[in-house]
């Protein structure tokens, strides 16, 4: 054991010398192998094996170094290498023995250490108390996980690239090389698409094409009747350039050609001139004074122009010219009529207008760049700038004091006219609004109204609206008061705690009318009004709408809901609105809270009174018996198990209330009727009627399964002799069908179940022998047989031995008529021939069978 460290020290010293003999490539290879061995030894945790592996590696590399030293050619290096090799072999032999002894001693320790380490790892993983990983461990785990995911992603990317490469190889292998013949055929087909042989044949003259001649040019017979060139020249003018041609209206051309309008008037219509605007039109202020002409120059130019005569001047001479110019600057809306201002103010306004015209010239040059709507807007803007409304502020309206007797008024009636102590002294008090008179305009004394200048003769204008302007648009401009409160002076009256008891308003009044004084009337200014200005539909006199009270509403409801007309028909509730309640908005009056005074009862006097004075009413007790179900025949369960409920009979007042309610009840209301269920017997009868189908029912004509070409079903022959003794029907009715009608087979049905409109008996109706004979007698003519005289009148009856009595009548001999020639094909008898009843029945039977 003592020689072990010595051997290790010698080994380390020799390794430094040995490294000098290695080349750089061999040293790198040696380091890589040594690192790999050390990692393998660390995983196995076997110290002995790792040391042995390192010694083996050194022994393996020493001969390599020795061989490389031989190649150098130096003799000294060879001797040193041999000496080192001999020393190493001796040390290795001694070391192997020591290592063998060491391994023998420590052979079981490694296995024990491995087992304990595995047990500790298992306990750490499965133990309940585990140590939480630190931040460094968590970071390391995340890095390892990220590296693992990145490696997996790279692996998947490599696999994907490999698959793509494999597919490329497959596609490259699938490419088929075409032969040269196929390529030439494809080129030939492509060349055929652009072949120009046909064009060359046409150009060379091999193919002759048909020549289409041009349309013949006919000689002009005369002017074109639809030519409007002359009208265009007349309207547009000959000086216009061809590039600026415009479309000419066909109507204007017709007027010019027919002579209705002259050329000058047509040119004026085609090029209308804009009318000169009056008033201030300077929208650009003083910046465009030099660019525009003055209005005076434009007026002078228009006055110097000579008027052109046309056909319409003759009509203008007959009409009287109005000397009053038309003022277009006046707005058309309703405006207030101004009072006539003094002459001095008018002169000042005219002077100001002239100065404004000089400063703001007319901009008529720029009319071509504007529209008519812009011109109207400009006029309104200029008018709003120049027009100044005179507004007079009325601080207080002076009203005449009304003199009324004060004896009839109480002291509290003037409380609303008293001044309040908390009112601000500087702010004037707003007067109450004046009461509007019943008719006429609303005029307040002391107020100045703003209006425009009145026309000179308003009576001559049939469209004068001065009266309407006075009535509609009279405004009084008062001083602004933002803090005005119209109800500030009113005293807040607290509502009474006890509501007044309801009383009948129609029974009479309990108030003393002598103490009632009418309210003071506000003084108004009376205006004399002519009878022509009276408006029959004027509602200005109505100051407030009086709503109907509860009594009036009840009368109206009674008239509308319970109104009985001439026929005695009572109006009911509307079926379209069943939930209508006319008293839904009416609040129920609160019952007055009255304090009841408890009086001490005198028992002595109460005992002395008779029972008649106590007004004792007898009460009748009844019992509520459940009504029996009349339709439920099979639900009789015996007597009712529920005990009877006693109740008191209603009084007369309640009966009257119920009668009133019954008047308003809908007669067709079925909401109170309980749901009636069918009994078992009724259900059985209905099932029997639905399931059992009678045999004599036939298919409907609309039956999809009906086959008109199907062979008829064989009908058994009728037994005409099987007839009952009691015959109650016609003679020609078949007996078998009659049995079905009378139900002689004993089906159990009564005669009441017979359908009087049943036509099933006429299904197979055929005429009898008697009917056929009657038809033959009607269709065939009768042949009269000649009756010859059997007895001779002249001969004696006794002689002949006939034995006739004396009084036996004898037929007289008639002269024989000649035989008539009867035509067997004569149809004159069949002119008015109509089918008989039997034929109609046959036709019906045939149609029904089909």
Curated annotation (Swiss-Prot):
Record-level GO BP terms: synaptic vesicle endocytosis; synaptic vesicle transport
Amino acid composition bias (Pro residues), ranges on this chain: 431-440
Subcellular location: Cytoplasm; Synapse; Cytoplasmic vesicle, Secretory vesicle, Synaptic vesicle
Motif (DPF 4): 666-668
Compositional bias (Basic and acidic residues): 28-38, 136-164, 574-588, 596-607
Ranges where the record places region Disordered: 1-95, 125-164, 345-375, 412-498, 573-610, 634-673, 738-760, 800-825
Main location: cytoplasm
Cellular component per GO, a single term: synaptic vesicle
Keyword annotations: Cytoplasm, Cytoplasmic vesicle, Endocytosis, Repeat, Synapse
Regions of compositional bias (Basic residues) in chain numbering: 1-16
UniProt remark on domains: The Asp-Pro-Phe (DPF) motifs, which are found in many presynatic proteins, are thought to mediate an interaction with AP-2alpha.
Note: StnB, which is involved in the same pathway, is derived from the same bicistronic transcript that encodes these two different proteins.
Protein name: Protein stoned-A
Taxonomic classification: Eukaryota, Metazoa, Ecdysozoa, Arthropoda, Hexapoda
Gene behind this protein: stnA
């Amino acid at each position: 054991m003592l020689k072990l460290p010595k051997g290790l020290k010698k080994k380390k010293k020799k390794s430094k010398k040995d490294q000098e003999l290695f080349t750089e490539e061999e040293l790198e290879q040696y380091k890589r192998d040594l690192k790999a061995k050390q990692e393998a030894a660390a995983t196995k945790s076997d110290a002995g094996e790792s040391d042995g592996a390192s010694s083996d590696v050194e022994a393996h590399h020493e001969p390599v170094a020795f061989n490389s030293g031989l190649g150098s050619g130096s003799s000294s290096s060879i001797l040193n290498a041999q000496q080192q090799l001999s020393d190493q072999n001796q040390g290795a032999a001694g070391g192997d023995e020591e290592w063998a002894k060491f391994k023998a001693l420590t052979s079981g320790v490694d296995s024990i250490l491995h087992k304990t380490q595995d047990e500790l790892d298992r306990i750490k993983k499965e133990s309940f108390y585990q140590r939480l990983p630190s931040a460094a461990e968590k970071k390391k785990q995340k890095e390892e996980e990220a590296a693992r995911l990145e490696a997996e992603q790279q692996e998947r990317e490599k696999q994907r690239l490999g698959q793509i490469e494999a597919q490329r190889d497959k596609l490259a292998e699938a490419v088929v090389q075409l032969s040269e013949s196929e390529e030439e055929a494809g080129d030939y087909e492509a060349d055929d698409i652009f072949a120009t042989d046909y064009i060359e044949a046409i150009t060379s003259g091999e193919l002759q094409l048909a020549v289409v001649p041009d349309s013949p040019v006919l000689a002009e017979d005369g002017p074109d009747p639809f030519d409007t060139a002359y009208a265009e020249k007349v309207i547009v003018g000959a000086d216009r350039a061809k590039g600026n041609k415009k479309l000419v209206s066909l109507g204007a051309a017709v007027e010019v050609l027919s002579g209705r309008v002259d050329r000058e008037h047509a040119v004026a219509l085609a090029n209308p001139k804009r009318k000169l605007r009056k008033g201030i039109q300077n929208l650009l202020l003083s910046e465009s004074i030099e660019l525009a002409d003055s209005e005076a120059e434009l007026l002078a130019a228009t006055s110097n122009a000579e008027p052109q005569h046309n056909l319409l001047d003759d009509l203008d001479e007959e009409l009287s010219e109005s000397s009053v110019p038309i003022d277009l600057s006046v707005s058309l809306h309703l405006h207030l009529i101004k009072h006539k201002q003094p002459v001095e103010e008018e002169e000042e306004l005219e002077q100001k207008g002239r100065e404004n015209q000089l400063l703001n010239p007319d901009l008529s040059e720029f009319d071509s760049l504007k529209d008519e709507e812009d011109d109207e807007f400009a006029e309104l803007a200029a008018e709003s700038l120049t027009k100044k409304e005179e507004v007079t502020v009325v601080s207080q309206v002076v009203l005449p004091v009304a003199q009324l007797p004060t004896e009839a008024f109480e002291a509290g009636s003037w409380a609303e006219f008293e001044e309040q102590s908390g009112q601000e002294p500087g702010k004037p008090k707003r007067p109450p609004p004046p009461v509007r008179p019943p008719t006429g305009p609303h005029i307040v004394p002391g107020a100045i109204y703003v209006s425009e200048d009145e026309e000179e003769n308003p009576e001559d204008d049939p469209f004068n609206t001065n009266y309407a302007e006075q009535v509609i648009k009279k405004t009084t401009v008062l001083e602004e008061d933002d803090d005005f409160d119209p109800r500030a002076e009113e005293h807040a009256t607290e509502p009474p705690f006890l509501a007044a008891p309801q009383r009948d308003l129609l029974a009479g009044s309990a108030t003393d009318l002598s103490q009632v004084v009418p309210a003071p009337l506000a003084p108004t200014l009376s205006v004399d009004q002519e009878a022509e200005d009276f408006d029959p539909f004027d509602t200005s006199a109505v100051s407030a709408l009086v709503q109907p009270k509860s009594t009036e509403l009840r009368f109206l409801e009674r008239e509308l809901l319970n109104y009985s007309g001439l026929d005695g028909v009572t109006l009911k509730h509307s079926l379209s609105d069943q939930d209508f309640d006319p008293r839904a908005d009416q609040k129920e009056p609160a019952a007055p809270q009255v304090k009841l005074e408890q009086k001490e009862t005198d028992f002595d006097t109460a005992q002395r009174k008779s029972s008649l004075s106590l007004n004792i009413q007898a009460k009748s007790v009844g019992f509520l018996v459940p009504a029996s179900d009349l339709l439920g025949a099979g639900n009789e369960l015996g007597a009712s198990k529920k005990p009877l409920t006693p109740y008191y009979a209603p009084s007369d007042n309640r009966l009257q209330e119920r009668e009133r309610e019954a008047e308003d009840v809908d007669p067709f209301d079925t909401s109170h009727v309980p749901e009636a269920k069918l009994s078992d017997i009724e259900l059985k009868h209905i099932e029997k009627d639905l399931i059992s189908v009678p045999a004599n029912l036939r298919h409907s004509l609309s039956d999809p399964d009906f086959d008109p070409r199907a062979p008829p079903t064989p009908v058994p022959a009728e037994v005409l002799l099987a007839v009952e003794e009691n015959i109650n029907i016609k003679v020609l009715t078949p007996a078998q069908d009659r049995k079905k009608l009378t139900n002689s087979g004993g089906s159990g049905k009564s005669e009441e179940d017979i359908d009087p409109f049943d036509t099933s008996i006429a299904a197979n109706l055929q005429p009898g022998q008697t009917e056929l004979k009657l038809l033959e007698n009607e269709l065939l003519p009768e042949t009269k047989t000649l009756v010859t005289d059997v007895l001779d009148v002249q001969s004696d009856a006794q002689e002949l031995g006939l034995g006739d009595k004396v009084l036996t009548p004898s037929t007289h001999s008639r002269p024989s008529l000649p035989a008539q020639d009867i035509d067997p094909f004569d149809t004159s008898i069949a002119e008015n021939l109509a089918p008989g009843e039997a034929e109609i029945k046959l036709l019906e039977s045939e149609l029904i069978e089909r």
